[in-house]
Amino acid sequence: MSWKLDKQFSDKICNFSHDFFNKKLIKKGKPISGEWTVLATLVLVVENTSSYEIKQVLSLGTGNRCLGKSSLSNQGDVLNDSHAEIICKRSFQKFCYNEILNLLQSKYYNSILFNIEYHDSNNNNKDNDNNGSLPTISIKKGHSLHFYVNQTPCGDCSIFPFKKETQPENFIEKEKLEKDGKDKIENHEKKEQKDIIKQVDKDKDEENYEDEESKRKLKKVKDDNNNNNNNNNNNNNNNNNNNNNNNNNNNNNNNNNNNNNINNNNNQYDDIQRTGAKTVFGEPEDKKLIGVDYHQIGVLRVKPGRGDPTVSMSCSDKIARWNVLGIQGSLLSHFIKEQIFLSSITIGDLFNHSSIYRGLIGRLLPNPTTTTTETSSSSSSSSSSSNTIPNFKLNSDLEIFSTNIQFQFSKLLLESDQQNNNKSTSSGLAISFCYPNQHEVTIAINGKKMGTNQKNFNAISQRSSICKFNLFKLFHQLVLIIKNKNSNEENEKNNQIVLIDSLFNYYECKHLSKKYYQEYEKLKEFKFKNWLTNSSDLENFVLDN
């Protein structure tokens, strides 16, 4: 049976991910009592004509914080975004580099995911890696990648309506609690900035550090518990029907119906699930009115910050971009034949099928359905023409699944525990893992390895293995091996690898991936015009020659 037809597939992916976290990862970096975090995994599934097997967790990430603009580095030596989804994606990229290196170094190496083929400078296929042969990497037939995250990604996916009558607290009191929490954070900001290095040395002090998003959503998640469990059950049924029919039109109808419910039948709903992610410049701003009109939907957002604003796009926006550009990124696109797309995404807490479909797929379609003036203007602000068919490849076949199985360190589970009378906080650490056994813990508030202090902050040894600089080093290792295998004079005249080998500038090497950036420019032109990009000053770092 295909995984698409298995009604228990999402629960199997969830359990496989949880078991891996609990049994295969060491304790280092995991939340302590009273702490919560977000978990994301990328799982390999291998399918044949009659069955499938959930094979391996290829990468994993935990975390829910990111750096403010003033904390970014122009050396590529810190992790800017430590949300679990992004840690998982960067860990997967590290896995890709390692696998390709192994394939290049040994013709006997059997990759768990990739095939390697060789061709000459005229793109003619060759049987082996003799001189003059260039490698092309592709995913093995029947192999697919499946993303799991234990709660809805921040940003557009997490905005959906609900009925106030299902909530255990008075709405006005809840709003007051949210405001009080935000004020307390702002009052303590200066003190915490001074103590930042001291805090990272002691795990127990991490509970005193919490960003605006964490504080705000603790109240909201607790309120939305009952309502969203109902949403999960309903949407599980919808998803199973969609899978059995394998019909994307059902997804479109679900998304359109949800938009109509929000905007045309406001009496059905009292409020909207809120996100701390802020709209980017150029997008319509949130109206912040009472009830369902608080947020705009379908717009680009940045992750919330604490006084120091961030320039990291929301996870909803980043995953949507993966549905066009792939999860391999620009540098790996030099070697990998086609974009690497996710086949499915399974989400736990705060699941709402329509909002997730809208955030990841619907708003990228040629004519996304909008039913209010404000939402329509949002769509046009991110699109040069809503009637123009985007000339880019969209992963519209992405399957969206839900699961009611909760992660043991989820915020929703922690807040619903009636025996927990202590204040809950988000973990200040982020775990990254990539297959087969590379495990690392970083400090989310400074983007460096666990154990970093004031004295060793700038030490090379304290850089994360998945920071830009270190992934760039892996990229150049690939380039050097390919160049050495491709040393005849004719190929050196025509080979872009030789050109790349002469460049040690991160920004320049990224932008040499012409196919990737052609797709990226199309995406910006037609849909994501206001996407925030890093200043070139932050990406002009170089490797030692």
UniProtKB/Swiss-Prot annotation:
SMART domains to which the protein is assigned, alphabetical: ADEAMc (SM00552)
Cofactor: 1D-myo-inositol hexakisphosphate
Residue ranges of domain A to I editase in the record: 59-541
Record's signal peptide: none
Lineage top rank: taxon: Eukaryota
Annotated residues for binding of 1D-myo-inositol hexakisphosphate: 89-90, 318, 321, 468, 510
Region (Disordered): 171-270, 368-388
Note on cofactor: Binds 1 myo-inositol hexakisphosphate (IP6) per subunit.
EC assignment: 3.5.4.34
Record: active site: 85
Reaction(s) catalysed by this chain's protein: adenosine(37) in tRNA(Ala) + H2O + H(+) = inosine(37) in tRNA(Ala) + NH4(+)
One biological process term in Gene Ontology: tRNA modification
Top enzyme category: hydrolase
Keywords recorded for this protein, A-Z: Hydrolase, Metal-binding, tRNA processing, Zinc
Record-stated family: Belongs to the ADAT1 family.
Function field: Specifically deaminates adenosine-37 to inosine in tRNA-Ala.
Name of the protein in its database record: tRNA-specific adenosine deaminase 1
Gene name as annotated: adat1
